[in-house]
């Protein structure tokens, strides 16, 4: 279904929007989903026209598969498309770690940060540490 949606969006000449694919694989790993399956999925979606990927994890650096790399790093290995990561990003250290691994082009802030009434000041303090 995802492939059909991406293909339909890209076929419309009147719509020139980038397409992001937001996904998680953690529920599939128990069913035998392997790195080769992720590679095939990403390649198929890239060929359909996905412009960037948004791998989802409860925590941005959650490990997966046998060598314990995070999902964002696996995605970066298999795709040259830009990546958005999210998931409990509450410190500059996490941003630096993801950037050092080369597995994040953009970062999405966790919704819990917006529960803080002074979220902007909180974020500013964190970034200035």
Language-model features and meaning:
Residues 1-129:
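Flavin-dependent oxidoreductase catalytic cores
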């Amino acid at each position: 279904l995802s492939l059909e949606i991406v293909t339909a969006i890209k076929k419309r000449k009147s719509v020139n929007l980038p397409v992001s694919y937001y996904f998680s694989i953690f529920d599939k790993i128990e069913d035998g989903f392997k790195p080769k399956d992720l590679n095939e999925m990403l390649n198929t979606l890239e060929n359909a026209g996905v412009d960037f990927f948004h791998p989802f994890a409860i925590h941005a650096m959650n490990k997966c598969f046998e060598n314990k790399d995070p999902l964002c790093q696996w995605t970066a290995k298999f795709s040259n498309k830009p990546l958005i990561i999210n998931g409990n990003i509450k410190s500059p250290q996490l941003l630096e770690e993801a950037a050092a691994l080369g597995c994040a082009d953009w970062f999405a802030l966790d919704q819990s940060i917006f529960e803080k009434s002074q979220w902007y000041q909180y974020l500013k303090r964190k970034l200035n540490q």
